[in-house]
């Protein structure tokens, strides 16, 4: 009969647990003890080791045979319940932001909430400055009204300063100076006189175009009728003739706009002066070259001869047999 069986018999008979034996404490072996052990030999050390193994086996057997009470079971449950995984509770974004703000303020770190863009407030207008601007604008309007009144009165032929003892205004004197200059010396006023001619009267007769007032236009330009007709035929690319009532009959159908454009080119090239833009010029021919002399400025320049360009086919083509 082994020792463990004897212990179990004691538990069953008496119903009480046997007293636990205390484990022998291990002592640290110093140099003297090591020498003593070495003197005793390997037999003493092996005997001590076997005694320790037997005591450990007895204590483990006693632990297995001891009954577990309800209190100990509850303690074990509490211990294992604390070992379960805890579910992470989702924190609301608002609470998290509040915590972060508290942490930043307490720890003394930067507060990034102040980095948000703030809406600009409209500046309240200064009433005094606004009133000053109004006064300045009103004075400016008054001066402009005065100048307008003076100019209007002068345009009507009335001089406001003649009927009163007030001081003269600069715009009044300036306007008076220019009016006197224009009346006494019109050529020094700097104004360009517009050169106007009678519009050409053009109408159709079948496949022909009749230019009725060509003689009047040539007299107004101070140019010969033959020279004007020659330029017209060269530009329009056609031919024609003059009837008994000094009307030009042009072969082909042409509109009034086309003849007006041709006359404008003739005036620019053979009538107006290139220096002073005056229409008072004379066209003369010397050694088969045309010269244009200006009566206003006295300049003389040569003019190109009229060249016949493209000739339009008007009549029927002759069939060569």
UniProtKB/Swiss-Prot annotation:
Keywords of this entry: Cytoplasm, Initiation factor, Metal-binding, Phosphoprotein, Protein biosynthesis, Zinc, Zinc-finger
Major localisation: cytoplasm
Phosphothreonine sites (modified residues): 139
GO biological process: formation of translation preinitiation complex
Cystines in this chain: none
InterPro entries per the UniProt record, alphabetical: IF2/IF5 (IPR045196), Transl_init_fac_IF2/IF5_dom (IPR002735), Transl_init_fac_IF2/IF5_N (IPR016189), Transl_init_fac_IF2/IF5_Zn-bd (IPR016190)
GO molecular function, one term: translation initiation factor binding
Subcellular localization, as worded in the UniProt entry: Cytoplasm, Cytosol
Zinc-finger ranges (C4-type): 273-297
GO cellular component, one term: eukaryotic translation initiation factor 2 complex
Phosphoserine modifications at: 45, 137-138
Region (Disordered): 1-117
Keyword Metal-binding set for record: yes
Matching SUPFAM superfamilies: Translation initiation factor 2 beta, aIF2beta, N-terminal domain, Zinc-binding domain of translation initiation factor 2 beta
Entry-linked Pfam families: eIF-5_eIF-2B
Subunit structure: Eukaryotic translation initiation factor 2 eIF2 is a heterotrimeric complex composed of an alpha, a beta and a gamma subunit.
Family: Belongs to the eIF-2-beta/eIF-5 family.
Role summary: Component of the eIF2 complex that functions in the early steps of protein synthesis by forming a ternary complex with GTP and initiator tRNA. This complex binds to a 40S ribosomal subunit, followed by mRNA binding to form a 43S pre-initiation complex (43S PIC). Junction of the 60S ribosomal subunit to form the 80S initiation complex is preceded by hydrolysis of the GTP bound to eIF2 and release of an eIF2-GDP binary complex. In order for eIF2 to recycle and catalyze another round of initiation, the GDP bound to eIF2 must exchange with GTP by way of a reaction catalyzed by eIF2B.
Name of this protein: Probable eukaryotic translation initiation factor 2 subunit beta
Organism of derivation: Schizosaccharomyces pombe (strain 972 / ATCC 24843)
Designated gene of the protein: tif212
């Amino acid at each position: 009969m082994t020792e463990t069986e004897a212990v179990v018999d004691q538990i069953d008979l008496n119903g009480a647990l046997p007293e636990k034996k205390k484990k022998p404490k291990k002592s640290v072996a110093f140099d003297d003890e090591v020498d003593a052990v070495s003197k005793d030999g390997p037999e003493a050390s092996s005997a001590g080791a076997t005694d320790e193994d037997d005591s450990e086996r007895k204590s483990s057997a006693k632990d297995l045979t001891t009954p577990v009470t309800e209190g100990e079971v509850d303690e074990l449950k509490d211990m294992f319940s604390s070992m379960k995984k805890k579910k992470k509770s989702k924190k609301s974004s608002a609470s998290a932001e509040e915590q972060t703000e508290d942490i930043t303020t307490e720890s003394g770190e930067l507060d990034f909430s102040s980095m948000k863009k703030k809406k600009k407030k409209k500046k309240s207008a200064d009433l005094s400055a606004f009133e000053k601007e109004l006064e300045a604008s009103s004075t400016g309007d008054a001066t402009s009204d005065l100048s307008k009144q003076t100019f209007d009165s002068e345009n009507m032929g009335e001089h406001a300063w003649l009927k009163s003892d007030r001081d003269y205004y600069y715009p009044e004197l300036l306007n008076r100076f220019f009016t006197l200059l224009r009346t006494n010396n019109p050529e020094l006023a700097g104004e360009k006189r517009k050169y106007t001619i009678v519009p050409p009267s053009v109408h159709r007769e079948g496949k022909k175009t009749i230019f009725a007032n060509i003689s009047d236009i040539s007299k107004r330009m101070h140019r010969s009728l033959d020279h004007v007709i020659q330029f017209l035929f060269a530009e329009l690319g056609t031919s024609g003739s003059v009837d008994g009532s000094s009307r030009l009959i042009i072969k082909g159908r042409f509109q009034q706009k086309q003849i007006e454009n041709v006359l404008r080119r003739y005036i620019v090239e053979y009538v107006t002066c290139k220096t002073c833009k005056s229409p008072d010029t004379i066209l003369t021919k010397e050694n088969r070259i045309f010269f244009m002399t200006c009566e206003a400025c006295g300049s003389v320049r040569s003019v190109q001869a009229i060249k016949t360009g493209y000739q339009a086919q008007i009549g029927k083509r002759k069939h060569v047999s």
